[in-house]
A protein has these predicted regions:
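Short, amphipathic alpha-helical "lid/cap" segments that border enzyme active or binding sites
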Residues: 160-168
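Flexible "cap/lid" loop of the alpha/beta hydrolase fold
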Residues: 17-22, 26-62, 71, 98-102
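Conserved loop-alpha-helix segment in the C-terminal half of the alpha/beta-hydrolase fold
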Residues: 123-151, 157, 169
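Gly/Ala-rich beta-loop-alpha elbow adjacent to hydrolase catalytic centers
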Residues: 3-4, 8, 12
Length: 177
């Protein structure tokens, strides 16, 4: 069972089906692209993502660009449903994504076409809007979709029990299948 959050969903989608005994995918507020789609392409498909306005680009010496969420906007953008002190720690320790990775088109064989998937995400996610999550879950024929009312992009931080429950449910269904 593979589990991924946010951009990690795009990475997980492109794991080769023959890479091992993968029995399912759990997308935790994650991207599930079709061939040729990128995370940024998907983020713009439906209204509600304000990530582009909240990202701070930092040029690297190799010519690539790291993207950070502006620390002043991190709480409202990424994790509005957790305490401000916790959000400040998360903002200070965030790891960047490269712009190149977020614009990279997905591969030709999405794993969600070959193994079952489950989705959990927040109703108020400002990075990957709930409408987009529903769209991706529908085309992936997700076995179960959980939208958590009032939850942000950091759904696994603010709602760890619900997130863990879905992961355990998915794993137990696959073990008994």
């Amino acid at each position: 069972m593979l589990v991924a959050h946010s951009y990690g969903g795009a990475v997980m989608t492109n794991v080769a089906a023959d890479a091992g005994e993968i029995v399912g995918l759990v997308y935790v507020a994650g991207f599930a692209p079709e061939p040729g789609e990128s995370a940024f392409t998907l983020a713009g498909m439906f209204p509600g993502s304000t990530l582009g306005d909240a990202v701070h680009p930092v040029p690297r010496s190799d010519g690539k660009t790291d993207l950070y969420i502006d620390p002043d906007r991190f709480h409202s953008q990424f994790c509005a449903d957790i305490p401000a002190e916790q959000a400040a720690r998360m903002a200070a320790t965030q790891r960047p994504a490269t712009a190149e990775a977020l614009y990279e088109p997905s591969g030709e064989r999405p794993l969600w076409r070959e193994v079952p998937s489950w989705f959990v995400f927040g109703e108020l996610d400002r990075n990957i809007p709930a409408e987009l999550e529903h769209y991706m879950a529908k085309r992936a024929r997700a076995r179960r979709v959980i939208e958590i009312p009032g939850a942000s992009h950091a759904v696994s931080v603010a709602h760890p029990e619900a997130t863990a429950h879905l992961i355990l449910e998915a794993a137990s269904l696959q073990v008994t299948a």
